[in-house]
UniProtKB/Swiss-Prot annotation:
The lineage of its organism: Eukaryota, Viridiplantae, Streptophyta, Embryophyta, Tracheophyta. The keyword Ribonucleoprotein applies. Keywords: Ribonucleoprotein, Ribosomal protein. SMART domains: Ribosomal_L2, Ribosomal_L2_C. It comes from Arabidopsis thaliana (Mouse-ear cress). This is Large ribosomal subunit protein uL2x.
Length: 258
């Protein structure tokens, strides 16, 4: 009898929790207050830092506390072009400069934005990954909503009071850079999840995987499996509608979708 395969072992035990003790903290806007609703607040970027497990760099921004004689430090997702010593302005009367935070109703149509709120005051939800940005499509003053285009291409309607940062998230093109060596991949996945290195099924013995064994590395049978296959057999192309290269009409439809 074969061994319990990798796909079966994944289902056992508790859900993996990523290592968060060395993270720098949650990246979000300031809490929405009177100053941002009616004017603007001025802050300064004190440093640009790397957050383990996150692709985009973070910016530590210091604001003057509105009520006490001290500084308020916030962590923002850094926009492309942001630098240490830069002055940031948050509020409805802030200028349209990369890194500033404004409500959507104060941002013109066609502007590139990032770290957009979903609900007023939730401190940023959409377009936060490295290189991501959203685009303001239109404003509807009748019901005070704005229509934005998300990085996925989907359109979304959100309240015009939701805040957004001008510009796109820094760190674009990060995934295009080759790993070059296994050590880089090791450090990448060490802070993310327990999924590396990943041995191919055809490189295993037949006792360890349905694709294993043979005098050369080959699957040896059709790689498609039925939907109700038992867990030890359910590897490969699960319940595939079709396999192989797209030809003819299917290829034309796929290119249209892209």
């Amino acid at each position: 009898m074969g061994r319990v395969i990798r796909a079966q072992r994944k289902g056992a035990g508790s859900v993996f929790k990523s290592h968060t003790h060395h993270r720098k903290g949650p990246a979000k806007f300031r809490s929405l207050d009177f100053g941002e609703r009616n004017g603007y607040l001025k802050g300064v970027v004190t440093e640009i830092i790397h957050d383990p497990g996150r692709g985009a760099p973070l910016a530590r921004v210091a604001f003057r506390h509105p009520f006490r004689f001290k500084k308020q430090k916030e962590l923002f997702v850094a926009a492309e072009g942001m630098y240490t010593g830069q002055f940031l302005y948050c509020g409805k009367k802030a200028t349209l400069v990369v890194g500033n935070v404004l409500p959507l109703r104060s941002i013109p149509e066609g502007a590139v934005i990032c770290n957009v709120e979903h609900h007023v005051g939730d401190r940023g939800v959409f377009a936060r990954a490295s290189g991501d940005y959203a685009i303001v499509i239109a404003h509807n003053p009748d019901n005070d909503t704005s229509r934005i285009k998300l990085p996925s291409g989907s359109k979304k309607i959100v309240p015009s009071g939701c805040r957004a940062m001008i510009g796109q998230v820094a760190g674009g093109g990060r995934t295009e850079k080759p790993m070059l060596k296994a050590g880089n991949a090791y450090h990448k996945y060490r802070v993310k999840r327990n999924c590396w290195p990943k041995v191919r099924g055809v490189a295993m013995n037949p006792v360890e995987h349905p694709h294993g064994g043979g005098n050369h590395q080959h699957i040896g049978h059709a790689s498609t499996v039925r939907r109700d296959a038992p867990p030890g057999k359910k590897v490969g192309l699960i319940a595939a509608r079709r396999t192989g290269r797209l030809r003819g009409q299917a290829a034309a439809l796929a290119s249209k979708a892209d």
